[in-house]
Amino acid sequence: MTDQIDRSRKEAVRGEDAARVLESPAFQEAMQMLKDDIVKKWGDCPIRDVEGQKLLLQLHKLANKFEGLLTGMVETGKLAQLNLDALRDESAARKLFRRIV
């Protein structure tokens, strides 16, 4: 049980850290600049440069994946915090019953 609590605490802290990163104006500006630059270079890329287009597409997908990973960490952290809150608020009788069963 304590392993689960420790893991939940770590996930909750990691989620809070990820949320601070996502909410940071500097991060938001940097990600927007990155995405805008990728789209601009993609638009400027000659049609015959198929390899360059593929690389830019991969870079665009990678940028979105990175943001998605951070968002996933935030959501996992929120769920972990809800689980910790539920364990904390659980009655003593229910805790005893859960240990017996």
PLM segments and residue spans:
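Intrinsic-disorder/low-complexity detector
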Residues: 2-101
